[in-house]
Amino acid sequence: MTAALEPIILEAARSYRLPVALIHALIKAESNFVPWAVSPKGAMGLMQLMPGTATFLGVTDPFCPRQNILAGCRYFRLLLDFFCDSIPLALAAYNAGYQRVIDAGHRIPPIKETQEFVTQVLERFYASIKRGRRQISL
């Protein structure tokens, strides 16, 4: 992670009431902090926004770290609100799509990639909490 991203992450954490450590863990899992990352499925930028999601969120440049992080965190907050502040379900929805979580009965869908993603992000998030990284509570 570069220090240049930290003010953006702090802004997003405050704006969307997200723990800083969770944003770090999410970006690490999605793009390994590479702003120009593009997935085989077409997800773009630090928080790997799909084109339709980026458009919905008003992103004009998905490779702009500020736009990408703020939009990704806004979307994650929407998912958290929808799934009653369940971080695991919001992570699953972020990865697989919210409809798949609904179709799975409001559980993590039986998709290996999604299950591994949720586990990876949560492990990083909880490890960071154990290390005492600064938090902004939900």
Residue map of PLM features:
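Catalytic glycan-binding domains that act on GlcNAc-containing polysaccharides
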Residues: 1-138
